[in-house]
Amino acid sequence: MLYDYLIDVYGINEPILLSTIKYEDMSEGSIRQQIKKLTDAGILKRYDTGIYFIPKESVFKAGTSLPFYRVIEEKYLKESGNRCGYFSGVAVANELGLTTQVPMICEITSNKATNDYREVMLANNKVIIRRPKVLVNNENYRILQFLDLMKDIDHYSEVKGEVLKDRLTAYMEKHIIKFENLEKYLYYYPDKIYRNMYQAGLLKGVPE
């Protein structure tokens, strides 16, 4: 049964992208019909166009929903289980403890972007999608994410000096990012990134 397949492949309370469902010899049209039947029966819940999930049991009448950022990750940042994008903007600065700002708009960079800049709506939330400077993969997504942050660090960061340097280097050490990893991608960024890295104390302080 299709339901058993969905449980095995996607699990409970995880995003199910209609476009990724491949079940036996069932056609796309038949899959859509079966998904609609499961949704009408309350076995599946619709999150947004083409996105469903198997809800877990809940004591609340409204039931459960999916974490927004989890949906973003599956829809835009992964392709066949591999990385094809990353979060960017204020969310990354907040993750590193560089700002107390909470992002009102989700910003991502993805190989799936069809334009350099595009705005879409997902579950009534605005998402900004940018095309990457080079193709994103499992090996470079953290590096490109870090360089995107450094390009605009002067705009995002509320901390400076040693605090800024310590938080940046801690992140680099955590994800094993060395200057030699950054160097081959610097060509794709504007010259201001060198100034930002210097002012953050990274040109001489990047872990070797």
Roles of regions detected by a PLM:
Residues 1-76:
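Short beta-edge/loop segments at beta->alpha junctions of small alpha/beta modules
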Residues 132-208:
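Hydrophobic alpha-helical interaction segments
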Residues 27, 98-99, 190, 203:
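Short coil/loop linkers at secondary-structure junctions
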Residues 24, 28, 45-46, 85-86, ...:
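Alpha-helix N-cap/helix-initiation sites
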